[in-house]
């Protein structure tokens, strides 16, 4: 199966990385494509601040059209977006506008009443707010997820009056007491996006572009496809392909939710588009104390805070887990265990569908990979995620 190579800064051996492991990575990705676990893959690996591997294999779509995935294919990074929301919050902490223990109700009045009045920004960032988690985390069917509650209210919206999506989303109350349990809550990161907008007076999408994406020269990243880059976007079906073609031609502007209530809800839980190369630039900023090349997005102490385990003795039962002590940083996952070979203290985040960004601060190794699931994944598979991570980290000499 043909592998397309992208731009690199140096050969792997120059940074102390075994190039033969990249051959194994390509071999295993090809096998996963043959088994229909994934449609294709794009990856980028940097070591000691230098890109040492950058490639792609397989198809750039899930519609069965035989066009190749490229190293610079743009894709939806899904929940990896949450780390950008967390970074924006930390920037406002650094600038003295908020603290991690600021109560959400001090900024958003919908939270300034029972049972939400004790929820802080920190609780949202660590998934311990007690708010109902994403659908599918637990078997019970009611109350509905925040997104379903918003959707139900949106159907009644007259299209003219202000739509209170926050009240709609939290109308189910709390599933657990504040701080008692780790429950994966994407809605909490939409709330964090709204906090950024309210505190700065700048739409959070624009804030992230101005304060994170542009300084790091993440030129292929943004919340919506544009006429300039839509032709490079991965698509899941022919309907999405047609929409992207309209964006390319100028018939559509890329804002797929324009004119709906969703256009007013921050897409900071999972709406960013990027490339593996751009994500590695972002990851390197954390490896080097909040700076990369000539950009500064955070101070060193903020990076240390975000990459320090925040929870102690907080259980996680999401998706049938039975973890008595969930390891989590500020907006970043810090899971450890027999499935992973990265260093203790590594920060990472997965995106559904799937992709992963793993940042090993000790080894100065950062990897981003996009592995869109095919039918053989049955909705989710560890093989293109955890197994690939182990292959990548095995190259360290």
Predicted regions and their residues:
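Short, well-ordered beta-strand elements
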Residues: 53, 357-358, 364-374
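Short, hydrophobic/aromatic-rich segments at coil-to-beta transitions
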Residues: 341-347
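Short loop/turn microsegments at loop-to-beta-strand junctions
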Residues: 39-41, 52, 203, 353-356
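Short, gly/Ser/Thr-rich active-site loops of penicillin-recognizing serine hydrolases
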Residues: 307-317, 376-397
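Short, conserved catalytic-motif segment at the N-terminal edge
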Residues: 3-6, 13-77, 99, 167, ...
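Short, surface-exposed loop or secondary-structure junction motifs
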Residues: 2, 116-341
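Short, well-structured active-site flanking segments
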Residues: 52, 64, 72, 84, ...
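Short active-site loop at a secondary-structure junction
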Residues: 24, 31-44, 64-124, 176-187, ...
């Amino acid at each position: 199966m043909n592998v397309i190579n992208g731009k690199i800064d140096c050969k792997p051996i120059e940074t102390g990385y075994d190039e033969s492991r990249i051959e194994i990575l390509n071999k295993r990705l090809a096998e996963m494509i043959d088994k229909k676990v994934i449609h294709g893959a794009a990856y980028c690996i940097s070591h000691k601040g230098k890109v040492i591997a950058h490639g792609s294999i397989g198809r750039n779509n899930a519609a069965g059209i035989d066009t190749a995935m490229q190293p610079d294919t743009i894709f939806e990074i899904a929940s990896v977006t949450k780390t950008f929301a967390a970074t924006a919050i930390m920037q406002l902490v650094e600038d003295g506008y908020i603290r991690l223990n600021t109560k959400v109700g001090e900024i958003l009045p919908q939270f300034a009443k029972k049972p939400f009045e004790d929820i802080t920004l920190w609780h949202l960032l660590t998934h311990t707010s007690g708010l109902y988690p994403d659908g599918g985390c637990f078997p019970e069917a009611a109350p509905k997820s925040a997104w379903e509650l918003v959707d139900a209210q949106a159907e009644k919206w007259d299209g003219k009056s202000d739509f209170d999506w926050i009240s709609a989303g939290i109308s189910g109350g709390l599933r657990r007491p504040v701080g008692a349990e780790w429950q994966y809550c994407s809605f909490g990161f939409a709330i964090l996006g709204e906090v950024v907008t309210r505190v700065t007076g700048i739409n959070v999408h624009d804030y992230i572009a101005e304060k994170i994406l542009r300084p790091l020269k993440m030129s292929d990243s943004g919340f919506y496809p544009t006429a300039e880059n839509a032709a490079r976007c991965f698509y899941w079906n022919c309907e999405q392909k047609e929409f992207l073609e309209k964006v390319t031609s100028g018939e559509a502007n890329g804002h797929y939710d324009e004119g709906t209530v969703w256009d007013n809800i921050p897409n900071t839980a999972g709406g960013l588009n990027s490339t593996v190369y751009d994500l590695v630039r972002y990851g390197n900023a954390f490896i080097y104390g909040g700076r990369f090349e000539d950009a500064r997005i955070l101070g060193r102490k903020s990076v240390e805070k975000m990459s320090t385990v925040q929870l102690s003795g907080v259980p996680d039962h999401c998706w049938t887990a039975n973890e008595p002590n969930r390891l989590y940083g500020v907006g970043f996952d810090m899971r450890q265990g027999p499935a992973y070979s990265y260093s203790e203290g590594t920060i990472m985040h997965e995106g559904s569908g799937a992709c992963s960004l793993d940042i090993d601060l000790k080894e100065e190794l950062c990897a981003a990979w996009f592995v869109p699931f095919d039918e053989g994944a049955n909705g989710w598979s560890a093989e293109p995620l955890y197994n690939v991570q182990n292959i990548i980290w095995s190259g360290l000499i």
